[in-house]
């Protein structure tokens, strides 16, 4: 019984609702002023914040390297340490280190640049040259 009454009320109200929608519904001014934008718009904000210091970059890279199980001795992590010769990492480990550095500093290192990073000092030098690194 309730279902029948609800369906009858909906049929009776349908023309009135349709005409109100066609006529337009008044919207508040703040709703009308909002521009239509794409569903997702990536925006990167820059500020004049402090630039990374060399010792800070080195300590963060050393922390990343010390998290790798394959580093033969964490005491060997120095500013001039070579990933393969001094730390005992192979080429795949070096790729993983570069990826971890990308994640640590929120940057993307192109493959041609990543191929040149084989030591801590090269990694520090590269990070310092990137204005997006944080």
Swiss-Prot record:
The keyword Lipid metabolism applies. It comes from the Eukaryota. Pathway: Lipid metabolism; fatty acid biosynthesis. Carrier of the growing fatty acid chain in fatty acid biosynthesis. May be involved in the synthesis of very-long-chain fatty acids. Accessory and non-catalytic subunit of the mitochondrial membrane respiratory chain NADH dehydrogenase (Complex I), which functions in the transfer of electrons from NADH to the respiratory chain. Complex I is composed of about 30 different subunits. Its main location: mitochondrion. The modification O-(pantetheine 4'-phosphoryl)serine is found at residue 91. Belongs to the acyl carrier protein (ACP) family. 4'-phosphopantetheine is transferred from CoA to a specific serine of apo-ACP by acpS. This modification is essential for activity because fatty acids are bound in thioester linkage to the sulfhydryl of the prosthetic group. It holds the Pfam family PP-binding. Residues 55-131 form the Carrier domain. This is Acyl carrier protein, mitochondrial. It is found in: Mitochondrion. HAMAP family: Acyl_carrier. PANTHER family: ACYL CARRIER PROTEIN (PTHR20863), ACYL CARRIER PROTEIN, MITOCHONDRIAL (PTHR20863:SF28). Keywords: Electron transport, Fatty acid biosynthesis, Fatty acid metabolism, Lipid biosynthesis, Lipid metabolism, Mitochondrion, Phosphopantetheine, Phosphoprotein, Respiratory chain, Transit peptide, Transport. GO terms for molecular function: acyl binding; acyl carrier activity. GO terms for cellular component: mitochondrial [2Fe-2S] assembly complex; mitochondrion. It comes from Neurospora crassa (strain ATCC 24698 / 74-OR23-1A / CBS 708.71 / DSM 1257 / FGSC 987). InterPro entries: ACP, ACP-like_sf, PP-bd_ACP, Ppantetheine_attach_site. Residues 1-46 form a transit peptide. GO terms for biological process: iron-sulfur cluster assembly; lipoate biosynthetic process.
